[in-house]
């Protein structure tokens, strides 16, 4: 089984005016696709080629040393972007509901306080990377990771990811 570029559940222009159609197309069909292509090349013919992407990046230390960097960068890029495309839905809600809302309120006191913390994680990430809302034990937390690292690599569950690479917003 080769890893595949997921189809977007919306058109490239569906995120306008926040992300223009050309940026969404390049980001998905070029950048994300490159991560998938390079990941497949790295794991082709190995026992790792059939792993779920999140299972694969969670076991980086168990991979052969010569595969770890390629899987970290490209597997992380594929996993991160797959979540990214799922959570930035056009016409989505501006505020969380249900269990996510309760967890945010319990941890941060309010959605506005969460937004401040999340924005801080995104704007203070030196260089390229991601800002995250993660499940950490019985609570949620805000964190950031460099490059294409994923919270999954640290045993955490990402709920929301914001790509802060320069290529995300030409």
Swiss-Prot record:
Residues where Fe cation binds: 27, 81, 163, 167
Gene Ontology CC terms: cytoplasm
InterPro entries the UniProt entry points to: Mn/Fe_SOD, Mn/Fe_SOD_BS, Mn/Fe_SOD_C, Mn/Fe_SOD_N, Mn/Fe_SOD_N_sf, SOD_C_sf
PROSITE patterns with a match to the protein in the record: SOD_MN (PS00088)
Alphabetized UniProt keyword annotations: Iron, Metal-binding, Oxidoreductase
EC number(s) from the headed UniProt entry: 1.15.1.1
Enzyme class, first EC level, given as a word: oxidoreductase
GO molecular function (one): superoxide dismutase activity
Record-linked Pfam families: Sod_Fe_C, Sod_Fe_N
Cofactor detail note: Binds 1 Fe cation per subunit.
Keyword Repeat: no
Its biological purpose: Destroys superoxide anion radicals which are normally produced within the cells and which are toxic to biological systems.
Family note: Belongs to the iron/manganese superoxide dismutase family.
Assembly and interaction partners: Homodimer.
The protein's name: Superoxide dismutase [Fe]
Organism: Raoultella planticola
Gene name as annotated: sodA
């Amino acid at each position: 089984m080769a890893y595949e570029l997921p189809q977007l559940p919306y058109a490239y222009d569906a995120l306008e005016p926040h992300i223009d159609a050309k940026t969404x197309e390049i980001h998905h069909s070029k950048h994300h696709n490159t991560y998938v292509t390079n990941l497949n090349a790295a794991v082709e013919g190995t026992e790792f080629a059939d792993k779920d992407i999140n299972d694969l990046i969670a076991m980086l230390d168990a991979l052969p040393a010569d595969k770890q960097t390629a899987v970290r960068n490209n597997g992380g890029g594929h996993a991160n972007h797959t979540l990214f495309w799922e959570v930035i839905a056009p016409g989505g809600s501006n505020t969380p509901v249900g269990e996510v809302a309760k967890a945010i309120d319990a941890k941060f006191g309010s959605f506005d306080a969460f937004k401040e913390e999340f924005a801080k994680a995104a704007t203070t990430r030196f260089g390229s990377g991601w800002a995250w809302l993660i499940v950490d034990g019985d609570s949620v937390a805000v964190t950031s990771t460099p490059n294409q690292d994923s919270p999954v690599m640290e045993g955490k569950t990402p709920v929301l990811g914001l790509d802060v690479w320069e290529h995300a917003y030409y």
